[in-house]
A protein has these predicted regions:
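Polar low-complexity intrinsically disordered regions
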Residues: 1-2, 138
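Conserved non-transmembrane functional hotspots
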Residues: 3-18, 71-134, 186, 190-260
Length: 260
């Protein structure tokens, strides 16, 4: 049986653009701080035009790679959503390179697999996003201070274009933090609702999903998918590799309690 994940190639492309975007943002922040420090020396007058041109190039590159990352990421997310439904209900909506990957199951079994998929995904995602948020907090605080100082210095020196660039970079850092914070909150809410559905099923005499349980599950599935799509944030692969062993132990306990 093939195990190819249909969205992998699409996420690989989005991941490349995210790397380019990250390096451009870090390079722009570093260049901004260094050029601001150099602006207090006399020889800066000879390189001022070059600094302006490089700053504009960074700004254009950041906007371009952000646009490309978001478009390719949303395309990959669309394929992944179709793949999730295929996996749970035995349909063929996603890329045909996963032919043979999906099993034919009845509707109730499909809902159970869908609940397990969203439950497991939200459990792992909440831990990864929490780690990403802590790292972003440090970056926003430290990087934001230097960039804001550079922005003020450029404003005092009447270098409006460079001041705008520094202001843009500081807003980018703050926006990334706010997006991660909102994503963590939404994923935690989904995780709690999945636990509630599991408890409700465990306490029910019904062996199948009730209409209300189906509606709640579909709502949480939509909330989880929309949270990922709107945030346009790829979960950190290094954190995934680091946290996955612990996650597998936690998920095994949950699976044995509610799904086996």
């Amino acid at each position: 049986m093939a195990t190819t994940v249909p969205q992998k190639s699409a996420f690989d492309i989005a991941g490349k653009y995210q790397v380019y975007l990250t390096w451009c943002e870090l390079g722009a922040c570093l260049f901004s701080v260094v050029s601001t420090a150099l602006s207090f020396f006399e020889f800066y007058a000879y390189i001022e035009n070059s600094v302006t041109m490089i700053s504009v190039a960074f700004l254009i590159a950041i906007c371009f790679f952000q646009m490309r990352f978001r478009s390719t990421y949303r395309e990959a997310e669309s394929v992944r959503r179709d793949g999730l439904i295929d996996h749970c209900f035995g349909t063929i909506m996603a890329d045909t390179q996963s032919e043979g990957y999906y099993d034919s199951v009845d509707i109730d079994s499909g809902f159970k697999k869908l609940l397990a998929s969203i439950h497991e995904s939200s459990l792992l995602s909440s831990v990864i996003v929490d780690g990403m948020l802590k790292r972003q907090e440090r970056l926003t605080f430290i990087g934001g201070i230097f960039v804001v100082i550079a922005c003020i210095a450029r404003s005092i020196q009447s270098e409006l274009l460079l001041a705008i660039l520094n202001g843009f970079l500081s807003l980018r850092l703050l926006d990334d933090y706010c997006e991660l914070h909102a994503l963590r909150t939404e994923i935690r809410n989904v995780l709690e609702k999945c636990k509630h559905i599991c408890e409700d099923r465990a306490n029910s005499r019904r062996k199948t999903f009730s209409a209300q349980q189906q509606a709640h599950l579909i709502r949480e599935c939509i909330r989880y998918e929309c949270a990922l799509a709107y945030a346009s944030i790829m979960l950190d692969e290094d954190l995934y590799q680091q946290l996955n062993p612990t996650h597998e132990k936690a998920w095994k306990a949950i699976k044995e309690r509610y799904y086996d």
